[in-house]
Amino acid sequence: PPGCKLMEWGHRLSFAYLSRWEGEEDALSALAEHLIQTGGLLCSSCQVIFLDTDALGEGDAFCRSFVPLLERATDRFRAALGEKGEGSLYAWETRLEHAADRLPGTLFPGRGCSLTLREDRELELSPLHGNVLVKCLPQKALLPVLRRQKGRLQTAGLLCPAQDRPALTQLLARAGVTRIAPPGSMSRTLSGEGHDGEFPLRRYVRTVDIQEPSPDRPI
């Protein structure tokens, strides 16, 4: 109908950006739990783990150390038989696609989960249910890469030294990210927070200003 406002929100992409990960087992465990609990199904779910490096060797070492954390999260949070089966199905499908050379990258398989280290730097969807892409993305390339997805970005899970956080937060905001949180809190919501960068109800509420007459000024 004329004058009817439409809901304009669509699918969004979220990711984790790690500029430091050695010695951060608690934060990485929280990220692994987020990946398993959300299964990559939410707009705020991490689709790609970006590492602040351009060395694939560092990406390889990260994947080898992170797979056990994913397996531990899988054992903890997939209690139902259906959940275990779904995660295992996606993991085996990913493994078969790699075996048939249909998917690029190096596969790091785990129990009901997997990591795939890719050489490109693009933000894209992961295979879901604990099967996640890992890519190297140094800070100098972060802005142009993310701006290619501007308008589709939502949450960034940021893990970095405290002194680097203000600069990285500003950089992510400039790229178009609308929510920045610790990696394990990417899908946690806060009362009154915005959605995709705005307070949605303001678009569907009409503001009426009313001024009451006062005794000394009736008109």
Residue ranges, per PLM feature:
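Rossmann-like NAD(P) dinucleotide-binding subdomain of oxidoreductase/dehydrogenase enzymes
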Residues: 1-36, 41
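Glycine-rich beta-alpha junction loops
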Residues: 11-15, 22, 48-55, 161-162
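NAD(P)-dependent aldehyde/semialdehyde dehydrogenase
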Residues: 29, 37-157, 166-216
